[in-house]
Amino acid sequence: MNRLKEKYNKEITPALMKKFEYKSVMQVPKIEKIVINMGVGDAVQNAKAIDSAVEELTFIAGQKPVVTRAKKSIAGFRLREGMPIGAKVTLRGERMYDFLDKLISVSLPRVRDFRGISKKSFDGRGNYTLGIKEQLIFPEIDYDKVTKVRGMDIVIVTTANTDEEARELLTQLGMPFQK
């Protein structure tokens, strides 16, 4: 069993039940899924860019991402409907906990001038969105093979009803929020 999942079951669940006075264990918020999205704007001119993004996302997430395509044509961006413009991957279960553990303990501390992540990125429904400026913070990415520095969005979807509950859950899991 994953280290974070074990910690969640043994320590975090009882602590959250006590703090928020839940009557049932099923009311305790948990992480449902993590969605990693990488927009590749230069895929419009360069079709190979999407392949490198898919490859990098595969290394980072441990599973193959799905290529996202344009829903509408936008003349200003020279974009046609159906053109590949990004890649996303949804992690659940064991892989989700592995990725979160790696993100908290290895990747985030590698960010330059890292002082913690913002507390304001909750959406009001208990989900947290985190933007990363470069994919090089992940240990799986080989620095020499990177063609272009790309950022990504990481959305952590929880079953929490409020932001306060979700913040407490992520703090207990070890998310380094700003003081």
Curated annotation (Swiss-Prot):
The keyword Transport does not apply. Pfam families: Ribosomal_L5, Ribosomal_L5_C. Transmembrane segments: none annotated. InterPro entries: Ribosomal_uL5, Ribosomal_uL5_bac-type, Ribosomal_uL5_C, Ribosomal_uL5_CS, Ribosomal_uL5_dom_sf, Ribosomal_uL5_N. GO terms for cellular component: ribonucleoprotein complex; ribosome. Keywords: Ribonucleoprotein, Ribosomal protein, RNA-binding, rRNA-binding, tRNA-binding. GO terms for biological process: translation. GO terms for molecular function: rRNA binding; structural constituent of ribosome; tRNA binding. Part of the 50S ribosomal subunit; part of the 5S rRNA/L5/L18/L25 subcomplex. Contacts the 5S rRNA and the P site tRNA. Forms a bridge to the 30S subunit in the 70S ribosome. This is one of the proteins that bind and probably mediate the attachment of the 5S RNA into the large ribosomal subunit, where it forms part of the central protuberance. In the 70S ribosome it contacts protein S13 of the 30S subunit (bridge B1b), connecting the 2 subunits; this bridge is implicated in subunit movement. Contacts the P site tRNA; the 5S rRNA and some of its associated proteins might help stabilize positioning of ribosome-bound tRNAs. Belongs to the universal ribosomal protein uL5 family. NCBIfam families: PRK00010.1. PANTHER family: 60S RIBOSOMAL PROTEIN L11-RELATED (PTHR11994). This is Large ribosomal subunit protein uL5.
